[in-house]
Amino acid sequence: MEYLVYLVLGACAGVLAGLFGVGGGIIIVPVLVFSFTAQGFEHEVLTHLAVGTSLATIVFTSINSVRAHHRVGAVRWSLFTWLTLGILVGAGIGALTASYITGDKLQKIIGVFAILVATQMALDLRPKASRSIPGKPGLIAAGGVIGWASAIFGIGGGSLTVPFLTWRSVPMQQAVATSSACGFPIAVASAISFMVLGWHDPLLPPHSLGFVYLPALLGIAVTSMFFARFGATLAHKLSPRMLKRLFAALLYIVGINFLL
């Protein structure tokens, strides 16, 4: 039964990513926490397992997105390069930070983040382009913060990278495309870090590679890669404002549940 949950979750995450332009991690992590709890996984490790698994799935789902954006020349590779230098370091530190946070506290942190993202989507809050692109040190520092936070929340960083780039006067289309590209190094560095940090944890269930649960990774990755395209197509046929409000409502429910 749990394998069907992973396949459906991957499909939903893919559709949501295509519809709203956000990484599937914001919905994958909560559902995995509920699924792992239902399966009787140890409470002390299941949240970290959900975060690590979510990040590992983004490694695969980000590839299709980056290729699509690259074909139309929307990725600012010069920005990507310097952001990535900070991301690689920040993601490793973020995973290490998460390993020192208890499962209950980590759930509350993710719950607060889900509510913040929901509020941003519901009110359509966007930073105004008010500053120019920073120099190399500034991009590296920004990448470090984005990588650190993304590793803790189990996301690909789109909720952080896009606002930063648009604030720095990067056009929205290029900001989304460059953010998608940044999701790959975030996911790779974070997933590897979670694997290493959980490698010898005796509380992990069978078929785990550190804090990455392989059955969930496989099921989610397979379907999300296909359904992301469907979501992107659907986005052009439905009301974006109504869809964002519906997704925001879902995130409010998830966030409040994690905080209770």
Where are these regions (language model features)?
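Juxtamembrane transmembrane-helix boundary motif
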Residues: M1-F20, I27-H48, T53, S62-I152, ...
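Hydrophobic alpha-helical transmembrane segments that constitute the membrane-spanning cores
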Residues: G24, V188-S193
